Regions:
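Cap/insert and terminal regions of metallo-dependent hydrolase folds
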Residues: 114-182
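Short, charged/polar "capping" segments at the starts of alpha-helices
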Residues: 30, 52-59, 179-182
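Metallo-beta-lactamase
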Residues: 44-97
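Active-site metal-binding loops of divalent metal-dependent hydrolases
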Residues: 4-6, 26, 53, 82-83, ...
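Short, hydrophobic beta-strand segments that form beta-sheet elements in well-ordered domains
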Residues: 1-3, 18-21, 44-53, 62-63, ...
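Active-site metal-binding motif and surrounding structural segment of the metallo-beta-lactamase
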Residues: 7-50, 118
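Conserved beta-strand hairpin/beta-sheet module of binuclear metal-dependent hydrolase folds
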Residues: 1-14, 87-105, 118-119
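Conserved catalytic scaffold of divalent metal-dependent phosphoesterases
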Residues: 70-77, 84, 96-98, 107-108, ...
Length: 182
């Protein structure tokens, strides 16, 4: 499982089947403190992987470092830096001969390991053209252009997908889509 920024009631049934929880970074939509505490108490067999900032606040079993592989059973995870406004990691791993990449809340994929990948779970937050249209406006109560620049655009996500996919059957699952600017 990756991240736990939701109430425990939304994920409890799934927790009986998992062995590893990866927490990408310290934002409340990625780690809900109550949910995490409940997982630690009620599901002690689940081992948590997170970066040192996540560890300092919440405590994890395995502290991830960019570029250093982490082995959990048959799976080897490779964390990489995913630039955001806090320390954030994306991850690459293989299962059943298929290579998977997961990255969200980042503005560039420049630190991602090279493909090819079979599965892409990556941020596809906004359409660059829509953001350009609101560049100098605060119509939504905040600087939407500045906020968007902290997130990967749909164009950048698709560019990464097309240049790093194994073949035309590689799957692209878009994450963190903006309801206003996608």
């Amino acid at each position: 499982m990756i991240d736990c920024g939701v109430p425990i009631s939304k994920i409890r049934k799934k927790l009986y089947k998992i062995r590893t929880l990866i927490v990408t970074h310290n934002h409340s939509d990625h780690i809900n403190s109550k949910t995490y505490q409940t997982i630690r108490k009620q599901f002690p067999r689940i081992k948590t992987i997170g970066n040192y900032e996540v560890h300092q606040i919440h405590g994890v079993d395995i502290i991830a470092n960019a570029g250093i592989e982490i082995k959990r059973g048959e799976i080897v995870y490779l964390p990489f830096e995913a630039p955001h406004d806090v320390l954030n990691y994306g991850y690459v791993w293989s299962v059943g001969g298929e290579r998977i990449i997961y990255a969200t809340d980042l503005w560039t994929m420049e630190n991602a390991p090279e493909g090819p990948f079979d599965w892409f779970f990556i941020e596809s937050n906004h359409d660059e053209k829509k953001i350009e249209q609101v560049m100098d406006k605060r119509a939504y109560g905040y600087d939407s252009w500045r906020a968007a620049k902290r997130h990967l655009s749909t164009q950048a996500a698709k560019g990464f997908y097309y240049t790093n996919r194994r073949n035309k059957d590689s799957k692209f699952i878009e994450l963190h889509k903006s309801s206003k600017f996608y």
